[in-house]
C-alpha cells in the first residue's frame, strides 16, 4: 500500500452509493475508507442483480450481508425482522439512525456510530438543491430497500460498520426526496441490521478483483461530501 492510502482522514464523510447512504468517521485511514466504500458498493450491486429489493427484501438483505462476509467482513450480529411503528410521520432515515445507534452502542459502548449516521443524514437534507444529488435521486428513487450505514476505525485499527436496511416503496411523485427521507406508509415494515468488522487480511486478497469489477461504476452513481 502506498503512503497516501495510509494517511489518516481528518473529516467525517458521507458517501451516497446506489441510493444508500454510507457515513465514514474521521480517523479512518484513506485505504480503509476506500475499501469500505467499494465493498459496500459491490455488495449492493450484487444484491440488486440477484433479487428484486422491493419484492424479495429478505433475500436481497441476506445476499448483501453474505457478499460483505465473502469480501472479508466478519458479522458478529445480523437480524431481519418485522417491525412495528405507531407513527407514520417518521422518516426511514430516522428509523435507521436509531437502529445504528443501538447496535453501535452494543458493539462499542458509545454513541459514536449513531451520532455519525445522524450527522450524515442531517447534512444530506441541506444539499437537496445540489444538481448531482438530484440527478442521483432520480436514478435510484425506485429502490425497495433503503440502506444507511456508519463506519469508523477504532484506536486499535479495527474497522467497524453498522448497516440498517428498511423495506420501503418510493412515493409516486416526480420530486420525491431521497429514500432515507421517505415517510413510512404503513405501521409494519421489515428491517435488517448488521454489525460488521473488516478483516483486512482477507480483503487484501480480493481488493483488486472488486475494483476491477466495479470499474467506472466506482465513481458513477456515487456522490461524496464532507459532513
Task: Identify the meaning behind each predicted range.
Residues 1-40, 44, 48-49, 61, ...:
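C-terminal assembly and membrane-engagement modules of membrane-active proteins
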Residues 45-52, 56-60, 65, 72:
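Long, solvent-exposed N-terminal ectodomains/accessory regions
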Residues 74-77:
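Short juxtamembrane and helix-loop transition motifs at transmembrane-helix boundaries
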Residues 79-134:
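Membrane-inserting effector segments that mediate pore formation, membrane fusion
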